[in-house]
Amino acid sequence: MSLRNVAIIAHVDHGKTTLVDQLFRQSGTFRDNQRVEERAMDSNDLEKERGITILAKCTSVEWEHDGTTTHINIVDTPGHADFGAEVERILSMVDGVILLVDSAEGPMPQTKFVTGKALALGLKPIVVVNKIDRPDARPAEVLDECFELFLSLDANDEQLDFPVLYASGRNGYAGRTDDVRSGDLTPMFETIVSHVPAPGLDPEGEFKMLATLLDRDPFLGRILTGRIESGRLDVNMPIKALDVNGNPVEDGRATKVFAFRGLERVPVESAEAGDIVAIAGLTKATVSNTIAAPTVTAPLAARPIDPPTLAMSFSVNDSPYAGRDGDKVQSRVIRDRLIREAEGNVAIRVTETQGG
């Protein structure tokens, strides 16, 4: 089985999550009798309500063609400059990017921010002009705008020689000419496999993985997601965490190893270089830490987590209306909720004042 790791970049409401839904359906990720919500990758309530991507997330599809199965890990990136640290960490896991633009609106300012990060990392883009069936579509002008965008971001010659697809995510088809109005997403699968390079990593070396996402499970505790840069990881294997300076954070065992299958994390017995996996078993390790075999002493290069840009103080409500509305009115409840959120959200830091 071959492997591809790719990220999708798009502005708000340009159809990224709808297109990924169709990739799921046409690759057989969803069973015929499985009830699936629209915009399945929008996982929290605010994302579903606003149609935006706040938290990066991983998923995968398997595409079979000519007797060969290709496992494609897809990373859905935040589309906002506010989440810059997360954007850069996520892009370090992939080997190519899909730039999805609206056929009428073209590339937007927030698209420029994330695309610039991808090009600076040397990733090769695929341009998808989505919503090609819009009556006000202007695909030729939008393609020119994408080329001008890449030029302004100092793309190299190889990055400027990008493939172009025209698609309708809602109707589930893509083609290589702007007059396409039917079909399926086979051209997109073919382009991903042919244009995005397979991970060129070291399967024989010692196990190393850079933690890029942090989550928390009520039963398993802290879960760290990243791409294995070298070696092999087995369940119950001894591991340790190193900070960005190489200082030890903790030692432990990989009590659970998960791969991504569709929208779900699926337990696996082992994984190897190039795989994007989630690991349980560590209690202190966090994003930007290197998770590695016990004999490893040098951490992987990592960008430190950006500090929060907004500070808030929560104090006891001493107004005349205190306690009249709501059922969770104690400051202790707010404290517990913030601390619980900080366990799985590296953008939040909670500091208690003297006296609680």
Regions found by a protein language model. Name each.
Residues 1-356:
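Structural and coupling elements of P-loop NTPases
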